[in-house]
Amino acid sequence: MPAISISEVCISNKTTSYDDDGEYGSDYIELYNSSNDVVDLSGWGVTDDKDCPYKYILSSVTINPGQAMILWCDSKIVDTSEYEDDYIIQDVHAIPFRLSGGETVVLSDPEGVQAAVAVPKTISAGKVYSFTLSEPWHYMVNDPSPYYVESFYTEEDIRCTLKEPEFSIEGGWYDEPVEVGMESGEGTIYYTTNGEDTTPDSEIYDGPILISDRTDEPNVYSAINGISLDYEYLPTDIVDKCTIIKAIVIDGDKVSPIKTETFFVGLKGEEYNKIPTISLSMSPMDLFGFDDGIYALGKVNSIHQDKTGHRHGYGYANYYKRGIGWEREAKLEYYSEEHKKLFEQNIGVRIHGGDSREANQKSFSLYARNIYDGNNAFIYDPFTHSNGEGICNKLVLRTGGEVEMYYTKLRDVLFQILASDRSIGTQRAIPCNVFLNGEYWGLYNLQEKVSECYVQEHYGVMPNDQILIKKNILLDNNEAGAFDDVIDFAKMQDLSLRENYDEIKNMVDIQSLIDYYATEFYSGNPDSFANNVGMWKSTLPGGDGYNDGRWRWLLFDLDEGAGLKTEESGADVDSFIEGNYWGEHCPIKDDALFAALIRNREFKERFITSFMDLVNENFSYDNASVILHDMAEACKEADIKSQQRFRGELTDEAYYPDLEFIPPYSEEDYERDINVVDSFLRERGGYMTKYLKRDFELKGSLCDVIIVRPDEDASIGVNTLTLENINGRAWKGRYYSDYPIELSCNPGANVLFKGWRINGKEYADNDIRIPLNNSIIIIEPMLQDK
């Protein structure tokens, strides 16, 4: 065996091994030093072409005795100048070729002595071509063991499938302890009660299992540290617990699928009666393990410390890593607020979010895939309460963002609801209690995930026929720079000219764009525009409807608005010109697209009237406060419990009410935080109406528009609004007199539209534009029974 050998080759690396930055995806070649000496690899060559043995020449790298080193076939440029002097390099990047199978990988020393490996044309996903120390001349397709050479091959047993064990009672909610029996037609039953998957090393079932309230037992997963660099508060009190039984049947070389049931015994808190509960169970090592735990600082952070001597560094922890390589299998069980199990499914779980990954309570992305249970979509739609496989394959359990998770957790969801009838995509959400491996893990919002399946479900455009951008990043493998043509056109052309404005109207859905900007402005979200922006378009040529090829906007992550940052998102902040985090110190002038569009008179009128539509209806205090307090009442006990579990003594100096916070989080704290949002909703309309006139240089005055509505079944259109269900009462809004308002009437099936009576004057046309030349405009649709 030569001193330096090629010990492992990987030609497809979606989930096989990650590099020293925690990234999957690149092919790799592993080298192994079997000698007793340190070997300097300077001048050694590696290639996939026998006729060009020094395609890549190694430099300034040594390999210690018994050490394995990986050469990554990627384009990553690494600056090693900041590495600690004693750091032993185990990763070499930027090998300038890719492996696809069928080639011969050759390693050559400076004298031309070679070691070669002929790679098979095909290797199964998740497998590599490697040798063992016992047979270094014998390469086989095997499980990966990056940075380590196995002593022997381990052969997997190929097992037939037995029927899963039967439980004597179903999981669910029980007031008193219960006994759970299990039986199978053949074989031996093995089981676990801690969330771990069952193996032949698990406990053997030999009689009924008594399940009681486990809450008084010591915390296990809630007591694990190493989950955050910034805030690792762990609860000092015991947390609520349920019992997860996982069981399999084994008979010789046969095994059954895992049967999972969750038992909630003695948990009677009001928080469990108002909102649904989700149980997530998965291998503890997949959550908190050093190498592969997605909730942990883990190996990625350890390597970063070894390299640089620094523990901190954005992105350098297991929980920061993305992609399917950092997805772990889990069992999801969903219970209604009435404690009925509505569905269960094996799914994939990843950590979700940006900076919020640093928190002790992390968000989760949930994926339905046929590799887990044969389903490529969720088998139940919690938003419509419908069974059967649909098209949604991605959901998210959100904590509420990196700051809002420690307060009300409802700001984002609130504004998504308020804007849900507008021309922007909004995410439906359901507040849920979550248990993780049997321990209470706090309040989450189960939300739709901005993804290609979201666009398909809501707009009917297939994933292969759409381009989707989120946070200025193209999702999946779509056209690079797909939105650049819109921005370039806006920057280079004078959009005040009709022909140029008409052209950009063919590129973007103007109302969708307006509704996105107006919602972000009004909510006071400082983390918008350059960051939390989503948009999509169809790529089908010559289509109509949503297939017309125009860009449309998606709304997400409004967590830091509505007064959460007193100086940036308070009710009195002029969000048209200040408060934004991302360099747009004056968004209406510095945001390239909006600044170009607002120069056009038609766009300006449409924006102003649409904005006032939202002020008068969607975001009006009468409407928004009812929704807020309904949400607050439903989540009250759950949010307080969640904050007591995760918040500890944490305060935010940018949120002025925290000056009065004394832990633990209490009902008074919750009511205070809800009142901050309530005050924002009460005051925001007045401030933004005033800023609208000043910042957009309006010359007119505010006019009261009153629509007197008779009892007939009809709906009234006011600009972009459709007013329904206002029988027998008046609707009131305020608009600037700079622009007329547009009226229309849909009289319904049982009445006839006869015209309008406006300040005593009658008009016969249904669709009309009314100038606002009086301080009060009284409008009455004239209707007659058929």
Short names for language-model regions:
Residues S5, S124, F131-K321, W326-E329, ...:
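Short, compositionally stereotyped local motifs that mark structural "simplifiers"
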Residues Y18, I57, S81-E84, V117-A118, ...:
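Short, solvent-exposed loop/turn and secondary-structure capping segments
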Residues T80-V92, S212-P235, A571-H585, G648-S666:
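Surface-exposed intrinsically disordered loops and tails
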Residues M1-G181, G185-Y190, T198, I245-I248, ...:
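Intrinsically disordered, low-complexity linkers and terminal tails enriched in Ser/Thr/Pro/Gly
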Residues S17-G22, I95-P96, T236-I238, Y319-I324, ...:
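Short consensus segments that form the blades of beta-propeller domains
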